[in-house]
Each structure stands twice: as C-alpha cells, then as structure tokens.
Amino acid sequence: MDRSAEFRKWKAQCLSKADLSRKGSVDEDVVELVQFLNMRDQFFTTSSCAGRILLLDGGINGFEVQKQNCCWLLVTHKLCVKDDVIVALKKANGDATLKFEPFVLHVQCRQLQDAQILHSVAIDAGFRNSGITVGKRGKTMLAVRSTHGLEVPLSHKGKLMVTEEYIDFLLNVANQKMEENKKRIERFYNCLQHALERETMTNLHPKIKEKNNSSYTHKKKNPEKACAQCITKENDKELENDDDDDLGINVTIFPEDY
C-alpha cells in the first residue's frame, strides 16, 4: 500500500472513532478549525482542546497533580468567576489545584512538507512550543501548543491555604490567559487559511513553487515577518513579550511499534 493510500486509511479509521474525551465532543471555539483541517486531503485531527480553567482535587501524598487519579471539581472553557471556585473548593478533601491549560491540537499530516506548513503557521500565531514528530511507519504528527499555562495549589488536605483575594487575583490572571489564548486560536485559523491558499496557488503555478522552496526555513528564522497580513502590530508586540515560549522545530523518531 502506498503512503497516500495508507494515510487515507488512517484518516478514515480515526474520524470514524467515537470521541472518548470527558466532554465527548470538540470544543466550541475550535469546531470550525477542526472541521476545516479534516476537510483537507492532507490533514486530520487526532485530539484537541480549546483551552480551559480547571480546579482539581488530587491526593494528599504529594503536590504533583495527576489528572487521571484526581477529582475534577470545576472545568470551564470560558472565563471563570471567583464564586464558582469558592463553591467548588468546599468539595475538596485533598490538595486542590487551580490550572489554566492553553489550546492544544494534534494533527496527523500526509507528509513532512504538510506538517512544516502547519508548524510555521503555529509559530507565527504564537504557539511557539509546537513541534513535529515523525514515526518510522511514516506517521507525521504536528502538535500545536504553547507554554502560557498556569498551575497554583490552593488547598492542602482539604484546608484552604490562600485568601479569597488571592483566588480572585489568580482568576484574573487565568482569564487574561484565556482571552489571549482565544486570540491566538483566531490568528492560527486565519493564518492557516492564507497559508493553504498560497500553497494551492503555488501548486498550480510551478514557477512560483520553485521561487518559494526555501519559504519554510525563512519563516522559521523570521516568524514575526512570515504572516504579516494575519498579525497586527499589537498582536506582534504581545508575542514578543511571551518570553517563556521557545522557537524551533522538534523532530523525533518513534520506535518500530509506533
């Protein structure tokens, strides 16, 4: 079976499976983006989360939060208010932790070139911890992600360790991150549409394709210039201030049984 046929088989199998996430469906803020990618021949999404604010109640034998072994006291993909957190905290018996988790998207790509286009767009949109993973069987995965998360312990053994004023402060920070996260998703979607339109035009005109052969490398070195029509000066400034994010491409090889 050739690579294209094998990719189509993987795509059909993945998209026919039931959604096994807790919610059981794609988050509202990324439905259009996910549908757009899945309609393209060269991509399909394997998992996604639009970003969320969580209050988790973990065990009392350590501070490391394991989402699989803890109680979800509160989860929202929208802005969160203090009263909801205070009410949820009353149910905590162990170590409650407030978290903000930014947008994450995993996309299987038909070939490395397709993944490079998505990676370049993700970097330009502010998801600077994105990376590409290549398996020995030919599976090429693109992970869109960033590092602007938040994780703060609030209680220990069921006892609240912070003031309500501090909780209010943390929620302001988390909500700001949620709003910035949404802007980045919108930038990513807009830039993606422009990039794929350019790719289509390039494929229709071979001379343009030859001229743009080094575009991915150029974008990687100069992400602030690569999608000028998608990113305003104000947005560009926000990305410059995001010092925790790292630029670059991450390519690893999975074992044979991947």
From Swiss-Prot:
**InterPro entries, from UniProt?**
tRNA_yW-synthesising, tRNA_yW-synthesising-like_sf
E.C. number, please? 2.1.1.282
The pathway entry for this protein reads as: tRNA modification; wybutosine-tRNA(Phe) biosynthesis
Q: What biological process terms from GO does the record include?
A: methylation; tRNA processing
What keywords are annotated for this sequence in UniProt? Methyltransferase, Phosphoprotein, S-adenosyl-L-methionine, Transferase, tRNA processing
The reaction(s) annotated as catalysed by this protein in its Swiss-Prot or TrEMBL entry are:
4-demethyl-7-[(3S)-3-amino-3-carboxypropyl]wyosine(37) in tRNA(Phe) + S-adenosyl-L-methionine = 7-[(3S)-3-amino-3-carboxypropyl]wyosine(37) in tRNA(Phe) + S-adenosyl-L-homocysteine + H(+)
Note the superkingdom of the native organism: Eukaryota
Residues with PTM Phosphoserine? 25
Q: Gene3D superfamilies per the record? A: tRNA wybutosine-synthesizing-like
Disulfide bonds listed in the record: none
Q: Is the Repressor keyword given for this protein?
A: no
User: What does the record give under GO molecular function?
Assistant: methyltransferase activity
Which Pfam families does this one have?
TYW3
- Described purpose of this protein according to its UniProt entry: Probable S-adenosyl-L-methionine-dependent methyltransferase that acts as a component of the wybutosine biosynthesis pathway. Wybutosine is a hyper modified guanosine with a tricyclic base found at the 3'-position adjacent to the anticodon of eukaryotic phenylalanine tRNA.
Name the protein family: Belongs to the TYW3 family.
Query: What is the protein name stated in its UniProt record?
Result: tRNA wybutosine-synthesizing protein 3 homolog
State the organism of origin.
Pongo abelii (Sumatran orangutan)
Which classification does the entry list for the species? Eukaryota, Metazoa, Chordata, Craniata, Vertebrata
